[in-house]
């Protein structure tokens, strides 16, 4: 036990890279270009920060600039609305589908959280892991560095009971501190993606969540499961590999957020096939479904991008092997789907924040917002891959990443 405590202490110490502690003095960050997260572009501008908040954005480069980012592009801290921060490979390099000790699991989660933060993601939403609450609170207290975390803690699916039992589970999740309710309305893509929850169950879970003032995010691949979830009053649909024009339009008409995952998760599974194969439904049939899903996703994202008023938010479904590659989702939505680069950035900033009901706190660079800033090497409006080249990360007024050679501190 003492050895484990020493390991934990050492790990946290190593993770705690030197940061600029959020203080009361004014910090000024200047760059050639600033994208504010709402569609506006500012040239030769400075973000002024005091404590954890942005106090103003000024034109020009003041003499007393604290961080000169030169030709970097500043964007708001990126947001991933669907990341499995606790998923990891075990010591043998295989997917750890059975949890280890609590100490081991929190260390893996902390490592993934740190990796995600270094990739420019300052807020993520985790759809349910046993230690999510501890991780969320530890990061919030500054025990170790990581993105701001929202979590569903657990999930609700077709095995969660009767309508009344499901309503009770929703109330319990609220009591336990869940930020969102995660629902499985369909099977996995590896099992064909058909609807699994009944309409009655979906009406119960989304109805109770709405009554409790809680958000819902729904795993739904098939058109039937998407339609049933939207009609039940759910707020956000995940995946949607088999989404048709009709259900895409339904989501747009009902103001439901859509989080298609086309650039990270399936690619990661196929890249790491040997690490997953033979575990549960990670078998030959399952991988065949996922290979087919790549083409289906391309067709789907093209339709989604061209659906008027559809609110697409940025989520990756990042699992073991994918942490730190979250921005690839932004790149592939532009490449495969034809999404405009500015729209893709908005989906990962202000719109993602709105989907979390945090639109007045994060996702936008403006006075009064949390000082979450990311510096990118290049201009993502002309080269979307710039979102994968992160040289500067500030979260809540603290600098966690500052790459020498691309910018300088004064």
Can you say where each PLM-predicted feature lies in the sequence?
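Active-site core of metal-dependent hydrolases
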Residues: 159, 184, 190-295, 318-320, ...
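Divalent metal-dependent hydrolysis catalytic cores, especially in the metallo-beta-lactamase
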Residues: 108-132, 146-156, 178-189, 215, ...
